[in-house]
């Protein structure tokens, strides 16, 4: 597998509602894997599920790749040993949420945001 199937990609972009899920301003251009496909991640069944994806702008994708420590802290990247559905993500710069595999979000409270 090299990317999200069309059905999953559609869920991710519908959830984004035409806004980058990181900054909340720019139009999303790409589906970003929170847990990278490298290092064997593509063999895991949850790699190409909606909880592992964010619809993001090119500028935010570049920021994620260049500021990886920040990206892990904010849930935009997820370490290989973790399930993306269980790792909160900072969305639109202000909302901590959990992403599910149906294209939905669940708000997190203060205690849900502990670091994995």
Where would I find each of the regions flagged by the language model?
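Short cysteine-rich loop/turn motifs with clustered Cys
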Residues: 4-32, 55-60
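Short Cys/His-centered divalent metal-binding micro-motifs
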Residues: 25-28, 50-74
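Alpha-helical and His/Cys-centered functional microenvironments
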Residues: 36-37, 65
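A short linear boundary/processing microfeature
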Residues: 37, 73-77
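Short linker/helix segments within small regulatory modules
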Residues: 37-52
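Short flanking/linker segments adjacent to small metal-binding domains or redox-active Cys/His motifs
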Residues: 76-116
């Amino acid at each position: 597998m090299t990317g999200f199937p069309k059905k999953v990609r559609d869920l991710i972009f519908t959830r984004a509602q035409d806004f980058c899920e990181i900054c909340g301003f720019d139009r999303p251009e790409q589906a970003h894997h929170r847990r990278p496909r490298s290092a064997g991640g593509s063999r895991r069944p949850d790699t190409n599920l909606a909880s592992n994806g964010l619809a993001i702008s090119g500028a935010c994708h570049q920021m994620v790749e260049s500021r990886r420590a920040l990206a892990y802290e904010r849930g935009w990247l997820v370490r290989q040993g973790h399930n993306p559905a269980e790792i909160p993500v900072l969305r639109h710069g202000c909302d901590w949420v959990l992403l599910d595999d149906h294209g939905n979000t669940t708000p997190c409270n203060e205690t849900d945001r502990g670091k994995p």
